[in-house]
């Protein structure tokens, strides 16, 4: 099946460079305040059930790892989700340890997925984006720390929203 799809695409003079699971990645880690907002990204069968929605999203990412491998791809694009995003502004003050706890949980959710991507020989590239727990270089480095610098946890470079994030699109590469 993958060979057929790749053949159709290549027959049109195009090449598949990566697949994307931005919406499914978002659903791996949803802060409860955003449950209703993000339910629309999931199938009706798992809406209004955060646990089932998360399980569905995790499985979709694992399927995507295999699909990427089947298509001969070595990179895959996604979002990290946002357990901590509602606390990004430091008022009111966050309780001590909240950020560490949040990133430990984020890593716990993503490690099985990262391992599946590793088993399939595919890098998982997170787009740093407003509204995501991975929204800049510092948050990405904290995520790496909690995933023990997982070799498949990579960045997707999309500077289209860097002005909104007050990030210099050239300095960011360094």
Question: Language-model segments: what does each one mean?
Answer:
Residues 146, 165-174:
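A short alpha/beta connector and helix-capping loop motif
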Residues 11, 28-157, 164:
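Active-site acidic/histidine proton-transfer and metal-coordination neighborhood
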Residues 5, 162-164:
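Long amphipathic alpha-helical scaffold regions
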Residues 1, 136-139, 168-169:
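Residues at alpha-helix caps and immediate loop-helix transition turns in enzyme cores, especially N-
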Residues 17-21, 77-79, 154-155, 174:
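Non-cysteine beta-strand/loop elements that form the S-adenosyl-L-methionine
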Residues 2-6, 114, 141-144, 173-174:
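Short amphipathic alpha-helical segments and helix-helix/interface helices
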Residues 17-18, 25-30:
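Short active-site-adjacent helix-start/loop capping segments
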Residues 1-13, 18-19:
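Aromatic-lined substrate-binding rim segments of carbohydrate-active enzymes
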């Amino acid at each position: 099946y993958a060979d057929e799809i790749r053949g159709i695409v290549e027959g049109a003079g195009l090449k598949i460079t990566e697949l994307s699971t931005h919406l499914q990645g978002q659903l791996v880690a949803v802060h409860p305040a955003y449950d209703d907002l993000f339910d629309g990204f999931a199938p009706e069968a798992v809406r209004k059930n955060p646990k089932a929605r998360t399980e569905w999203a995790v499985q979709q990412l694992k399927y995507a790892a295999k699909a990427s491998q089947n298509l001969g791809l070595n990179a895959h694009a996604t979002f990290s989700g946002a357990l901590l995003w509602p606390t990004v502004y430091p008022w009111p003050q966050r309780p001590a340890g909240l950020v560490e706890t949040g990133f430990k949980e984020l890593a716990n959710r993503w490690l099985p997925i990262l391992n599946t991507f590793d088993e399939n020989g595919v890098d998982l590239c997170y787009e740093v984006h407003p509204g995501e727990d991975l929204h800049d270089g510092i948050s990405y480095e904290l995520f790496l720390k909690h995933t023990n610098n997982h070799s498949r946890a990579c960045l997707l470079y999309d500077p289209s929203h860097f002005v909104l994030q007050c990030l210099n699109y050239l300095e960011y590469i360094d």
